[in-house]
Amino acid sequence: MIKRVHLGQGKAEEILNLPNLIEIQLNSYEKFLQLERLKNNKPLLNEGLESVFRDVFPMKSSNGEVALEYEKYYIEYDSISFTEKECKRKGQSYEAVLKIRLNLQFLTTGEIRQKDVYMGTIPLMTDRGTFIVNGAERVIVSQIHRSPGVVFYKEKDLYYARIIPYRGSWLEFEIDSKKDYLYVKIDRKKRILVTLFLRALGLDTREKIIETFYKIRKIEVNDDTKREITGQYLATNITIKENMTYRAGDKITLQDIEDFLQNGVKEINLIDFDGYDSVPGKHFISSDVILNCFEKEDAYFALKDGFKELSRESVMLAVYSVLLPGEPISIDNAENDLRTVFFSEKRYDLGHVGRYKLSKKFGLDDLTTSVLTMTDIVNTISHLLRIYDGHDVLDDIDHLGNRRVRSVGELLTNIYKGAMSRVEKIAKDRMSNKEVFNLKPQELISVKPVVSAVKEFFATSQLSQFMDQVNPLAELTHKRRLNALGPGGLSRDRAGFEVRDVHYTHYGRMCPIETPEGPNIGLIVSLATYSKVNDYGFLETPYRKVIDGKVTDDIEYLSAIDEEKKCIAQANASVSSDGNYTDDLVSVRISGDYTTMMPKNIDYMDVSPRQLISVSSALIPFLEHNDANRALMGSNMQRQAVPLLFPQPPIVGTGMERIVAKDSGVVIKAKRPGRVVLATNKKIVIKPDNATSERDLDEYELYKYERTNQDTSFNHSVLVKNGQIVNKDEIIADGPATRYGELALGNNLLVGFIPWNGFNYEDAILISERIVKEDLYTSIHIKEFSIEVRETKLGPEKVTADIPNVSGKILSKLDENGIVRIGTYVKPGDILIGKVTPKSEGDITPEFKLLTSIFGEKAKDVKNNSLKVPHGTEGTVIDVQRITKDDVGNLPPGVDEILKVYIAKKRKLKEGDKMAGRHGNKGVVAKILPVEDMPYLADGTPLDICLNPLGVPSRMNIGQLMESQLGLAGKYLGEYYDVPVFESATNECIQEKLKKAGFNETSKAVLYDGYTGEPFENEVMVGVIYMLKLHHLVDDKMHARSTGPYSLVSQQPLGGKAQFGGQRLGEMEVWALEAYGAAHTLQELLTVKSDDMSGRVKIYENIVKGIPTNVSGIPESFNVLMQELRGLGFDLSIYDDNGNQIPLTEKEEELINKT
């Protein structure tokens, strides 16, 4: 194991250790399936799958005679047919059978029939946080979406309040600030006045509405108060005569006051606009918007008589016709329908998150009601009006308090909920339709909807992704990814700048650096190192509690909502050993503002400087000296590093390397402490200290050269010897891209920042032949090729070495069964599996028929359908798999067996391969120079790599220079360093190390030209830099074609390597040749060399016969154009110079020949 020297400004030990980096996956799935509780026979909590079944059951028949009750569910572990390794080999899913125990109760007789009902299979999560579906490892990415709850925002001149449920109809209120009216919309349909909506929900009079929203004050009516009352609004109705009522909400005129006095009205109730804040716990308003809506109502219903109240019928009809169109049956039904939209648990669910957000916003204690209440609607309207009046502030939609994370468990719960609601519908139908008393529980439950929904989710959902398995870091990052796309999320095209941007609440929760460059920027992000997801789905980050200016070791996890307005100090603030701040003023942040505060005003302190960035970014040493754009590229490119045969851990690391290797699941850790009794390259056996018997041994199977999802090699190498004592969790075997239990993505190289004869112009890289000879960047790539042996209508296909019309030389690589031998080196076009398919009679040529009639036997009636090595692939066959029906039990219909061949290729570094450092400094290898020609140091040491110094200043990634300097010192002192991000080694510290290693403190040295032996004019910056080989290899991109497939319609060559395509002579190339006046060259290129079908054949014949040729017909694209014009209704014909019609189709040719 490597001993690292800590070279940071902070302490070596952390206040809080990092959590398990894939716990977001493991915890979420455990919450969903509760496997631990099932194993230990503990009662299950009402969450995840259990909550789905509890919601659906009990089911009752419509006549109330029969009830189907749920007792429990369990997983049948005996039903797991294959291990994880076998599933990958055989293309199966790693899953178990799910059963539920149901009781069918006959309420009339009291009889109960119990049965365990099969509910399909459920994929199980591996301990690495992945699923194996159809032989491929997949990851369910967590989704970040708009949180249910209430949100207030403004767009243009409109103020909005939106209540978003977890399931159900959206309710939206909007104030049009130009007209001062408040409207309501349900599910973004047509808007209606809010007063009509309130009336429909039960506040059916003006008085009730005013009483709900406004503070009311009593005032005496006399000559002294006349002036004060004039222009005010009535809060209650006043009836003077039988037919004369002054309505609540009407404006009082002087004439009205005279009427009051004449009719003996002594006291009236007025709306008190100024007293909106005077009653604690009441959210009264000071706006007249609701009163304007009353006026608008009058206009809407054309009430000529100003003293009438609206009838219930007219209100219900008006609301129902807009919100729930289609003629209602009756007023009562209309009212009922409207109420069920928001107040029925079947149709509406705020979710515990939505209820929590509503209660938090309006200061309520209720955390249990899952539907909307009248109080919620009133509070929302009041709050919106208070915002409109400037008494409250708008919400920030991009605040992480308004966005939450849905992980695997919740996504699966929703899938099961949807499927079970269909199951419920079918069961209820069957309960009412069948002869009830002959029923068994399993006959009521249809399992099809559940099976298909789960299958569809894992196979096709946008959030179920093929795992990025290039290296352990890519794997880990993929499991920690947050995606704003997917079902119920945003779409790339509609997502604006604000959603993608970094927000202050991302601090410690989401990484501001790691995100893709391109259309997904800011929509796909990564979890920060210490971040966790709480029970409500909000992201939390840990802080140390500060009490009376003293820092404690108490850790509190805060969500973005809890953190608002708290004063938080940075992790690198100077603190004495007793927990007191050493400075009088400490740098702090409060919400999005940065300032300084006295220690006594501080609430919390960051746990670690690396808490605000993701795992990939935390692996970049001297991150704070890099420009953010380059840090982003550095984070992303580390994930593309190919695992090498002989990697080295970086001399300059950040302390995260060991943690990443451990949590990624690619290394093997000891489960219990003990002694190694066997260590081979296939398995390790450890006898634990607390073994209960001689046979109680821990066995660990090692993967040897297995293929990953991205065709890289997954290989374990043993780190322990026989007899060695190991501790619990000690790393006993390295995986791909790890060395001594640390992440090792590349190698340490001696670098000079020097231009060299133009070979490293524009980010190109010059490397020494030593790197290639010593296999420093050699990687193994494994490709899988498979073929199905099918049952055809004419008989079965056969795997055989007896293939018609194939030379013995080609067949020499196959064994007697027609399968390539393991260890054979194969090249493009070689046969891997010999397979023959029966021919139909129609395929037989006249010559064959002649032979058959002469010899009286069927000449070979099969055709060659063998699996061949595709273009651009060569390598050694390392494994062949035969999968038959006996092995797996369920092959696709019509398939007898599947054969898979694995070909491994050792790829050395070559010109055209892409390399990169950890600071976004990427380039392509332009030349591999013999060692003797490389520039060398005064002691004769040649450089390994030359990088262009012009790649540094404009890119502003100075981190690479500091890394090179410290790496140089480390190499010569034989030390490895930990340089944690945001508290890196200082310049002074680096210079000290360089001096100790015997170098100039600038790390500049005199270099000598390898060609001439002369020193270069100036000193050159020399160092040791950590370089990676990326998964963009020239071998995968190189492509050549002479002839190949053509597009069916245009008869032009296909494009791209995958289709074995060619190059297209496009519009611009034609212009270039036209500009030269190269008419004959152009004609040849546009006809016989391209898509003139008859010309192509003719020119080939002429070349074979050796005749000089000058043929050119009509290009096929011209025919396509003609047919398109005909399709538009133009009758077109074409004629040659002599006026003869040229046929475009065979049918035309026949017609012309006839005439």
Swiss-Prot record:
Give the domain of life: Bacteria
Q: Does the keyword Transferase apply?
A: yes
Q: What is its EC number?
A: 2.7.7.6
Gene (UniProt): rpoB
GO terms, molecular function = DNA binding; DNA-directed RNA polymerase activity; ribonucleoside binding
Give the range the annotation lists for the signal sequence: none
Q: InterPro entries, per this entry? A: DNA-dir_RNA_pol_bsu_ext_1_sf, DNA-dir_RNA_pol_bsu_external_1, DNA-dir_RNA_pol_su2, DNA-dir_RNAP_su2_dom, DNA-dir_RNAP_su2_hyb_sf, RNA_pol_bsu_bac, RNA_pol_bsu_CS, RNA_pol_bsu_protrusion
Keywords of this entry: DNA-directed RNA polymerase, Nucleotidyltransferase, Transcription, Transferase
Top EC group: transferase
- List the PROSITE patterns: RNA_POL_BETA
Q: What name does UniProt use for this protein? A: DNA-directed RNA polymerase subunit beta
* HAMAP family per record: RNApol_bact_RpoB
Q: Which GO terms describe its cellular component?
A: DNA-directed RNA polymerase complex
Kindly list the residue ranges recorded as spanning the membrane.
none
GO terms (BP aspect): DNA-templated transcription
The protein's assembly and partners: The RNAP catalytic core consists of 2 alpha, 1 beta, 1 beta' and 1 omega subunit. When a sigma factor is associated with the core the holoenzyme is formed, which can initiate transcription.
Function according to Swiss-Prot or TrEMBL: DNA-dependent RNA polymerase catalyzes the transcription of DNA into RNA using the four ribonucleoside triphosphates as substrates.
**Catalytic activity, reaction form:** RNA(n) + a ribonucleoside 5'-triphosphate = RNA(n+1) + diphosphate
**Alphabetized Gene3D superfamilies for the sequence:** 2.40.50.100, 2.40.50.150, 3.90.1100.10, DNA-directed RNA polymerase, beta subunit, external 1 domain, DNA-directed RNA polymerase, subunit 2, domain 6, RNA polymerase alpha subunit dimerisation domain, RNA polymerase Rpb2, domain 2
- Family, as annotated: Belongs to the RNA polymerase beta chain family.
